[in-house]
């Protein structure tokens, strides 16, 4: 009986998926799986001296099913990673590609608007799902000018085409929230997304500049290059230190595909 139990336990452990296999099955990042298991959203087992995560296939399938039901996916909707050749869009004279994660540096109030407003305006006109992360004053400034060039802003907000994610104090929770929003949009059939992050918002919820830098790097690795999204992060030199601005440039390598004169405002 002891040998049978031992063989059963070994067989059960062999049937578990490691984190790399689970990430491949769900088509998500390993970082996402860690966040979901840490938050209790996704069950996992811990095995060995290293307490490595292991997953049952049925738990992963059930987790995806719940996510899809929540998103009300369109029949035959593509998964996020399937859109690899998304078109470019012109913003302030630049042809910006989807999947690019770029930054803009500005030093005066009008600089906040130069790229953010046309990016959102053209996105709303094209039917893209758009996200705006900003402090309340920053959001009000951008929306005021956006309404002047796109009168249907209120309708876009009401219809869920223009979304304002909650500004989270914890960067893992912020990334998790964005990932869920992007998954919901893409599972429901949306092929193109846009995000504007006026990054003073992160300081307003007490992130350090180092946390902002780490967040940008993880966004790059787990979201920005994975989803069919144009991501624009804006930095005000009057708010961020010189090191904070340097880190912004280091964490947005896609920016160097474009003329810096258009990104440094």
UniProtKB/Swiss-Prot annotation:
- According to the entry, DNA is bound by residues in 17-36
Q: Which domain of life is it from?
A: Bacteria
Pfam family, any one: MEDS
Keyword annotations for this protein, in alphabetical order, are:
DNA-binding, Repressor, Transcription, Transcription regulation
Gene Ontology molecular function, alphabetical = DNA binding
Q: Tell me the InterPro entries matching this sequence.
A: DNA-bd_dom_put_sf, HTH_17, MEDS_domain, SinI_DNA-bd
What protein name applies here? Transcriptional repressor DcmR
């Amino acid at each position: 009986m002891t040998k049978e139990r031992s063989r059963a336990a070994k067989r059960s452990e062999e049937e578990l998926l490691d984190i790399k296999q689970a990430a491949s099955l769900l088509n998500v990042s390993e970082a996402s799986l860690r966040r979901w298991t840490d938050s209790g959203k996704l069950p996992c087992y811990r095995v060995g001296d290293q307490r490595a995560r292991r997953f049952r296939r049925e738990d992963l399938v059930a987790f995806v099913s719940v996510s899809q039901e929540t998103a009300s996916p369109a029949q035959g909707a593509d998964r996020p990673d399937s859109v690899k050749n998304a078109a470019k869009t012109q913003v302030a004279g630049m042809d910006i590609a989807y999947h690019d994660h770029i930054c803009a540096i500005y030093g005066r109030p009008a600089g906040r608007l130069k790229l953010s407003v046309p990016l959102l305006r053209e996105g709303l006109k094209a039917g893209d799902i758009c996200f705006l992360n900003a402090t309340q004053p920053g959001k009000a400034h951008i929306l005021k000018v956006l309404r002047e060039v796109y009168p249907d802003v209120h309708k876009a907000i009401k219809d869920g085409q223009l979304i304002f994610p909650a500004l989270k104090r914890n960067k893992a929770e912020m990334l998790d929230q964005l990932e869920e929003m992007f998954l919901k949009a893409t599972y429901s059939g949306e092929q193109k997304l846009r995000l504007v992050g006026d990054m003073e918002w992160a300081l307003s919820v007490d992130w350090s500049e180092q946390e902002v830098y780490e967040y940008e790097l993880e966004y790059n690795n787990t979201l920005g290059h994975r989803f069919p999204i144009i991501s624009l992060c804006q930095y005000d030199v009057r708010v961020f230190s010189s090191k904070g601005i340097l880190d912004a440039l280091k964490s947005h390598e896609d920016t160097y595909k474009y003329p810096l004169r258009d990104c440094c405002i």
